[in-house]
């Protein structure tokens, strides 16, 4: 199942992406909130409802109205927090070397992350660049993991239970 956040006119919505089309989940089931944050706060019950709707649309059981005029947003447009992790050793070593810094000795010992600006999350579309900063840009692959329920000091064996997507 692929969930999307999108905007029609001035309102943000939560949808499911099926076979190249977006369908509003709240229109299919009024118990599902019409935004990603409230949906994620609803936990597994809402996730299960959304999966059933997605399967019903895919299987032709539910004839849902497709959204036609929309703007895609970031999947979670207003996250409550955001962390960025150091994932690729080669990239970190190269970036540090370019700044004349030694590699972080603890890199291989435990996960390294930092808190980043959760208000800077953007969806697809035009990106405004600052030309005077091009020499300092550091391009890299980014991946997101959306946590769907509260937890603290979660062991690796239980981590998948906390991932919403």
Give the residues covered by each predicted segment.
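Active-site microenvironments in enzyme catalytic cores
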Residues: 1-11, 17, 31, 38-165
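A hydrophobic, small-residue-rich beta->alpha segment in the mid-to-C-terminal subdomain
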Residues: 23-36
């Amino acid at each position: 199942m692929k969930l999307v956040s999108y905007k029609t006119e001035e309102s943000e919505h939560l949808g499911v992406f099926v076979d190249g089309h977006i369908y509003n989940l709240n229109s299919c089931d009024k118990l599902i909130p019409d935004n990603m944050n409230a949906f994620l706060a609803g936990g597994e019950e809402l996730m299960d409802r959304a999966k059933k709707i997605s399967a019903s649309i895919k299987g032709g059981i539910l004839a849902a109205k497709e959204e036609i005029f929309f703007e895609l947003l970031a999947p979670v447009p207003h996250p409550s927090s955001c962390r960025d992790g150091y994932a690729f050793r080669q990239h970190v070593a190269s970036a540090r070397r370019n700044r004349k810094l030694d590699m972080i000795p603890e890199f291989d010992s435990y996960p390294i992350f930092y808190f980043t600006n959760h208000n800077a999350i953007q969806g697809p579309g035009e990106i405004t660049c600052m030309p005077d900063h091009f020499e300092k840009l550091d391009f890299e692959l980014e991946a997101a993991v959306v946590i769907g329920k509260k937890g603290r000091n979660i062991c690796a064996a239980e981590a998948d239970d906390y991932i919403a997507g």
